[in-house]
């Protein structure tokens, strides 16, 4: 293990030292069509989206068993470091560099943020500095692999996880971002609408989570049908609040300016999430369950996921329906996965995968002026085709990447390590769970 970390350290040191020899000229700002209000809002939005990753750490960390809180939180939190370095080197170029037939960007277009300066970009960021656009997009790349971690919580090796998220970011996330958000991307040219990442972020994370749950297999506690109590439900509530707050930057910030589209996205975000939260707890109550804080939090997040692709394209009433529909479908899926003995630990696929799918389909239905609801079929049909392509690519590609990772380093901890808990066996950090004097 020390050898693998030595190699990782050497690679990081090499990348960081490139700056001593490779220091592209940073152009002075010359753009005159930049609105300071747009810059102020996008700086704020970038900070809000960054907050979502620590929020996700609390959200996931509170759901797992006490012996796995730290490991689960760290798996989300560490993406802030890993993905940032990767994105500066190649990730941004793969997402938004010179397009190769609408499939992927040239990895050297913006190597080490070359040419990413304080001026606007004519197609990608005509109203804000290109550097600000890149930093905003970086936050999306950070949280996407973090979302996956909930599916294989309590049983994945940390070093294997680090390798997988690097591969995922390069071979899954970057192509999807290019297809969908680059002006030359083929999904973008088809007219497929993804305002803030329902497809790029949530569907990709959901399908990668599904593949991960299948390949890593179920936990021992799941096999033994042991009920695992959430470690800290207040953590879950705190994480939900941080996610909800950050999501305003996620969705409204995707307007790339302080404008009326941002206002609409802000409003639809809060409305859809509220509808989804209430739908989840009422639906649970109808089925004989007690109204729970966990249910309210999960429902709220499902609504946020579902409205993400539609936030700037739909009306307030349609946002209510999108949140409601996604909540019911995800709730049913959580129950259904247990029947198939699928140990997706924190229900990532039912919540993010299906939430993103519902949002993508209903965006094709309700998108103002071009949706099925307004008498147009083209956008809706392309959304269905895009859904098929993205589903096959993300699930199949992620499955292959897990297998490749397994060839390099085992994905799963040993049975004894799982029993002892990953906080101790992977990180050597544990809560004191016993009273002083107890063995």
Question: Where are each of the predicted segments found?
Answer:
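Hydrophobic alpha-helical transmembrane bundles of multi-pass membrane proteins
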Residues: 1-439
